[in-house]
Design a protein with these regions (language model features):
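General nucleic-acid-binding
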Residues: 1-28
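Amphipathic alpha-helical segments within well-ordered protein domains
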Residues: 22, 38-39, 57, 81
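Short, Lys/Arg-enriched anionic-surface-contact patches
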Residues: 32-53
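Short, amphipathic alpha-helical "recognition" segments used to contact nucleic acids or chromatin
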Residues: 50-64
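Short helix-capping/linker segments at secondary-structure and domain boundaries
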Residues: 63-69, 92
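Short alpha-helical "recognition helix" segments of helix-turn-helix
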Residues: 68-74, 80
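Short, solvent-exposed alpha-helical "recognition" segments
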Residues: 84-98
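Intrinsically disordered, low-complexity basic tails/linkers immediately adjacent to helix-turn-helix/homeobox/MYB/SANT
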Residues: 97-108
Length: 108
């Protein structure tokens, strides 16, 4: 008793849950409502992790070196490399987002 057991979900259930979460996110138009949703769904550490991942990707896009990011943000190079790989995905959302944010369609 008292042991944490890993909950297993099958692919169909995972897809259904992902589709429903996507629909919820698309329905939220107000930033305060989005903040409430994220507060309900994520722990403080999970929110911090997402924010850190966004900031490191922003740093990478602006040309900051992985070593400088690791030093400045006290992050592992492994984690930063993962963010770099996301930015290199040809059809990746974050690549498109930063291209539009910085009006730079040839970066990375």
């Amino acid at each position: 008793m008292g042991r944490n057991r890993k909950v297993v979900i099958d692919r169909a259930e995972e897809k259904r849950g992902g589709d429903e979460l996507s629909a919820i996110l698309l329905s939220i138009k107000d930033p305060e409502e989005l903040a409430l949703f994220l507060d309900d769904m994520l722990t403080e550490n999970e929110k911090r992790d997402i924010i850190q991942r966004y900031l490191l990707m922003d740093d990478l896009w602006k040309g900051k070196s992985q070593r400088d990011i690791a030093s400045d943000r006290a992050m592992s190079l492994c984690r930063i490399t993962r963010g770099s790989k996301m930015l290199k995905k040809k059809n990746g959302f974050m690549r498109r987002y930063f291209s539009e944010k910085y009006d730079d369609f040839t970066h990375i």
